[in-house]
A protein has these predicted regions:
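DNA replication sliding-clamp ring fold and its partner-interaction surfaces
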Residues: 2, 45, 49, 53-58, ...
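Short amphipathic alpha-helical segments, especially helix-boundary/capping motifs
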Residues: 22-26, 50-53, 86, 111
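Glycine- and other small-residue-rich loops at beta-strand/loop junctions that grip anionic moieties
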Residues: 37, 41, 65-66, 124
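Active-site cores of enzymes that catalyze phosphoryl transfer or operate on phosphate-rich substrates
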Residues: 1-48
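Short, Φ-rich (hydrophobic/aromatic) sequence segments
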Residues: 5-6, 52-53, 186-187
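PLD/PLD-like phosphodiesterase catalytic module centered on the HKD motif
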Residues: 56-60, 67-227
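Short, contiguous clusters of charged residues that form electrostatic/catalytic patches at enzyme active sites
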Residues: 43-50, 71, 75
Length: 227
């Protein structure tokens, strides 16, 4: 799949033919519960939705994201919360992006919707930099979990085949080192462990502006946005 994705980009850009990598590959043993997937654009969204739909009840769902605006994914998070999953979200406050000052769109508007339905949410405590993480951790049945991370923001622009994106989805038992580190990292950020300030309370960047809510909706709907 990796070669196919790279070959597609080369065709679009008029590049030379891709040289196939030499050497063998080793497949993960499906009986062990391990699975590794390389996903691009729309397939990232499909995987995220599948993960959220398959989440164990009760089970942990932990999302760390730079931009969150895709309506299907937001709905899936709300549905998972309603089913009894333990959902927590850390978002960039959308106040800085690539050296420019922003007005909070789209994350503060999305956050308001999540918090209204009692999903705990914290902001990355940024100081001019960006919380450029795109990571979704979901616990499944049979003591398994899937970790999805890479370049794709959870927005229409990134997930509906308008921008070249690439993510990895890794499924393994809950006790696998990767899953343990993913949970520990999220907990450290969430709780500001060891005196380090990683996140801030929701109220710090809460935004009740109706105009900005409409703006966020229009930008996500039309695609006329930077996210």
């Amino acid at each position: 799949m990796g070669n196919d994705a790279e070959a597609a980009v080369l065709r679009i850009s008029g590049g030379e033919e891709l040289i196939a990598a030499r050497g063998g590959s080793r497949a993960l043993d499906p009986k062990s519960g391990h699975r590794l997937e390389l996903l691009t654009e729309r397939k990232i969204k499909d995987k995220a939705l599948d993960m959220l739909e398959a989440a164990a009840v009760p089970g942990r769902i932990e999302l760390s994201m730079f931009y969150l605006a895709d309506r299907d994914i937001v709905r899936a998070l709300l549905d998972a919360k309603q089913r009894g999953c333990e959902v927590r979200v850390i978002l960039d406050p959308s106040k800085d992006a690539f050296g420019r000052t922003k007005n909070g769109v789209p994350n503060r508007q999305t956050a308001a919707r999540l918090v209204k339905k009692e999903i705990p949410l914290r902001w990355a405590a940024t100081h001019g930099e960006q919380f450029h993480v795109k990571m979704l951790y979901v616990e499944l049945d049979n003591d398994l979990a899937t970790l999805l991370l890479g370049s794709g923001n959870f927005t229409r622009r990134n997930l509906d085949n308008f921008n070249a994106e690439c993510d990895l989805a890794f499924t393994a038992p809950l006790g696998h080192e990767v899953m343990v580190r993913a949970r520990d990292t999220f907990e450290r950020w969430w709780n500001n462990a060891d005196g380090e300030i990683h996140t801030a309370d929701y109220t710090v960047y809460e935004d009740r502006s109706v105009l900005r809510r409409i703006s966020a909706w229009m930008k996500e709907t039309t695609g006329l946005s930077s996210f």
